[in-house]
Regions:
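C-terminal catalytic/substrate-binding lobe primarily of soluble NAD(P)-dependent oxidoreductases
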Residues: 13-14, 21-215
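Rossmann-fold dehydrogenase core element
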Residues: 2-10
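Hydrophobic/aromatic pocket-lining and membrane-interface residues
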Residues: 1, 20
């Protein structure tokens, strides 16, 4: 039919992919070189799962049970980098304390997709970020015991436990009241450059529909 499929052009992964690019452009302007380490930190996300999203994640988990070898692909941040393998990446599968931001951070459930796309973009731009580039994404939970407890809870919880059925999803009011806020921190020469990417409306619906339309 001549149709073209544009992958990863919604909330996953445009705000993250372009957020890193915007940050690196700023870092290069100021320091003459890119940051070798960037931390993506989700500071806020107000939205709901849809039944279709939940079904897709469920199908992914079912496929992993049938083909355990796919776990290696899912866990490899360079799986979309056409054979290129960079340095070991920061761990993002359990809660950690981000000392530079003074907050506990938890694993972000879409990081396995976003990190792969960020590294692929780096490859497609002839390693504009450098071949030693490191990147991870985590979810900010706050400082102190409360932050640690929240991070531990998210790390051990199942996001699909009370997911809606396919065809179900958030109301129009809920979609319009959603939002997100992602911080990107580029570490370079013992300094850190911060930029933020913010969006209105539910990340997976209102924001994603706008990004998909613009990508098309």
């Amino acid at each position: 039919s001549g149709s073209r499929i544009v992958f990863s052009c919604g909330f996953d992964s445009i705000p993250f992919d372009l957020g890193v690019l915007f940050l690196q452009n700023e870092v290069v302007k100021r320091f003459g070189k890119p940051a070798s380490n960037v931390r993506g930190r989700v500071r806020g996300m107000n939205g709901e799962f849809s039944g279709g999203t939940a079904a897709s994640l469920g199908a992914t988990m079912a496929a992993l049970k049938e083909k355990p070898e796919l776990f290696a692909v899912l866990a490899n941040p360079f799986a979309l980098s056409n054979g290129f393998t960079g340095p070991d990446q920061p761990a993002d599968i359990k809660p950690v304390f981000d000392e530079k931001l003074d907050t506990w951070v938890a694993p972000f459930f879409m990081a396995p997709i976003n990190t792969k796309n960020v590294h692929r973009s780096n490859l497609l731009m002839n390693h504009f970020y450098g071949e030693d580039f490191c990147y991870n994404e985590m979810w900010v939970q706050g400082s102190g015991d409360a932050g640690k407890a929240a991070a531990d809870f998210i790390s051990s919880s199942n996001p699909l436990s009370d997911a809606p059925k396919p065809g179900e999803g958030p109301s129009r009011e809920s979609r319009e009241n959603g939002n997100y806020d992602v911080l990107f921190c580029g570490d370079i020469d013992e300094q850190s450059v911060h930029v933020s990417v913010k969006g209105d409306m539910d990340p997976g619906y209102g924001s994603t529909s706008k990004m998909i339309s613009e990508s098309a």
